[in-house]
From Swiss-Prot:
Domain of life from the UniProt record: Bacteria
Protein's UniProt name: Phosphoadenosine 5'-phosphosulfate reductase
Family the UniProt entry places it in: Belongs to the PAPS reductase family. CysH subfamily.
Main location as per UniProt: cytoplasm
Compartment list: Cytoplasm
Organism: Salmonella heidelberg (strain SL476)
Pathway: Sulfur metabolism; hydrogen sulfide biosynthesis; sulfite from sulfate: step 3/3
Pfam families, per the entry: PAPS_reduct (PF01507)
Catalytic activity: [thioredoxin]-disulfide + sulfite + adenosine 3',5'-bisphosphate + 2 H(+) = [thioredoxin]-dithiol + 3'-phosphoadenylyl sulfate
Lineage of producing organism: Bacteria, Pseudomonadati, Pseudomonadota, Gammaproteobacteria, Enterobacterales
GO MF term (any one): phosphoadenylyl-sulfate reductase (thioredoxin) activity
Keywords linked to the UniProt accession: Cytoplasm, Oxidoreductase
Length: 244
């Protein structure tokens, strides 16, 4: 596998970009997660960033990437509506892993948004998408721009939802390379990694949460529910960061 030209790939239509990356992805599928990170750092352009929602299994990708690339900027888009346990988890992992945390927020405070738009998360799919655009997508776009990112690592896994089932290791999103080192990991592999490195699940894991986002759009798992049904009232899985 050789170095890839981001500018040249960005000039191609999306379908052609996927085809251009197909051979590289076929080879990346044969590598371990650690090897994928090392390959990306050697062959893809900097600056490098890692995004995290500090969700249930966030410690895995944070530890994995940070141990290979210490001080990599870790982007958190903070909506202001995270669980108290999430904010505590962020503090704990930032201290334990010595993370270079970069927090980005919407230009409007949560209270101001509610005054202007009402509770967007109660306004169906359209309201949720507007909420995500304001609180997730715009802050992430700003982060990528301000940090001059050209390669973005994230901890998505195919097993998490139908919308992620066919994602490749390497893609181009928002004009930058996006690398998903643990995309093919199952829950058992995640558990084994956490155990091996003395890491913890999010505190709400023990209370029956399989996925954690904002307090108003996250539900505990109940028998018969798919994991993706625990977010956004089952109306959608993605918050907008990993779409497009």
């Amino acid at each position: 596998m050789s170095q890839l030209d981001l500018n040249a790939l960005n000039e191609l239509p999306k379908v052609d970009r996927v085809l251009a990356l197909a051979e590289t992805n076929a080879q990346l599928e044969t590598l371990t997660a650690e090897e994928r990170v090392a390959w990306a750092l050697e062959n893809l352009p900097g600056e490098y960033v890692l995004s995290s929602s500090f969700g249930i299994q966030a410690a895995v990708s944070l530890h994995l990437v940070n141990q290979i690339r210490p001080d990599i900027p870790v982007i958190l888009t903070d909506t202001g509506y995270l669980f108290p346990e999430t904010y505590q988890f962020i503090d704990e992992l930032t201290d334990k892993l010595k993370l270079n945390l970069k927090v980005y927020r919407a230009g409007e405070s949560p209270a101001w948004q509610e005054a202007r738009y009402g509770k967007l998360w109660e306004q169906g799919v359209e309201g949720i998408e507007k909420y995500n655009e304001i609180n997730k997508v715009e802050p992430m776009n700003r982060a990528l721009k301000e940090l001059k990112a050209q390669t973005w690592f994230a901890g998505l896994r195919r097993e998490q939802s139908g919308s992620r089932a066919h994602l490749p290791v390497l893609a181009i999103q928002r004009g930058v390379f996006k690398v998903l080192p643990i995309i093919d990991w199952d829950n058992r592999t995640v558990y084994q990694y956490l155990q091996k490195h003395g890491l913890k699940y999010h505190p709400l894991w023990d209370q029956g949460y399989l996925s954690v986002g904002d307090t108003h759009t996250t539900r505990k798992w109940e028998p018969g529910m798919a994991e993706e049904e625990t977010r956004f009232f089952g109306l959608k899985r993605e918050c907008g960061l990993h779409e497009g």
